Structures are given as C-alpha cells and as structure tokens.
Amino acid sequence: MAVTYWTGENLTLRAIQPEDIVIFDSLDDEILRNMDSLHFPRSANNMREWVEEQLEKDEFRFIAVESDNNIVGMIETFDCDRKNGTFGYYLAVFEPYRGKGFAKEMILMVLRFFFLELAYQKVNTTVYSFNNPSIRLHEKLGFMKEGQLRKIIFTKGAYYDGICFGMTREEFELNHG
C-alpha cells in the first residue's frame, strides 16, 4: 500500500463527520481525562451540535481507522498560528489499540503535513504527568521537554502537572526526515 499524508502503514486519518457522534459519546474515562474533557453526560442532540461546530473551525480533526475500518483513535490540531508558525495537538487512542504504535503513526502523519506542506515551524503539546506512556512516546519521537506546569488538572481525586513538549521543523527533519 502506498503511504500518503493521510494513509500510513497501519492506519488512515479521515475527517470527522456528523455521524461520528457515537465515537465521542463512547469515549472511555481514561481518554477523556487525558484530553481534559471529562464532563457530565450530554444528550445526542448536544453531541451532534458539538461535532457540527467542530467541522466549521480551522483546526484539523481526524479519526484514525485501520485498514478494516476499525476506529483506532483521533488526533486534532489547535492553536494553529500561521503568523508565528506554531500549532498544538491532542491525541487519543482507544484502549484496545494502545501500545501498538498507532499514536506514533498518527503524530508523525500530522507533523509531516504541518511542517513540510503548511510550512509551520514548531509544534507544542502538553502531556499530563500521570500519562507515562505518552511522556515516553514524545521523548522517543525527539520532542524536547520545555517546561512543567504545576498542578494544572484535577482528576482521579488529585492535581497533576502538565509536561510541555515542543519540536521544531528542523528537529523533525533531523529525526524523521
């Protein structure tokens, strides 16, 4: 299979569609905690409105699917600042697919597009201190730890830090060129 920006070796990134509300409605608590999105239950109508609002924004939101069309997770970009060339992203991988390289593939597809096609020069992301697998992944990908925001999220009955990671286009090309 040919590898393109949106089709990797093991998965494809596709746009979110209104019928995807069932995906957002079924996210497990661990994913929602990692995205700082643990909320009271929402009605199907509220979820549909939220998905439709997301479709109108400039940021990119993708659903990651395997070749057999199973949904692996999602990745979305935010704070896309063309003037300064910076952006951020959130990532979620569903429980049965964690630890199998899907997060790495999703991140690299988005970084490749933003750095090499849209000419952004820096990506920033924050990983919560309780998410050790994500911390290890970002370090392994060559992200630099740029700081730590103390006690920025309350979940599971405690406050946790946010670890700030960044990578420049030059670092990406050096590590993943």
Swiss-Prot record:
Gene3D superfamilies the record matches: 3.40.630.30
Q: Which CDD domains match?
A: NAT_SF (cd04301)
What molecular functions are annotated in GO for this chain? acyltransferase activity, transferring groups other than amino-acyl groups
All copies of the N-acetyltransferase domain together span 11-170
Q: Which domain of life is it from?
A: Bacteria
Range of residues in the leader sequence: none
Family to which the UniProt record says this protein belongs: Belongs to the acetyltransferase family.
From the Swiss-Prot or TrEMBL record, give the protein name: SPbeta prophage-derived uncharacterized N-acetyltransferase YokL
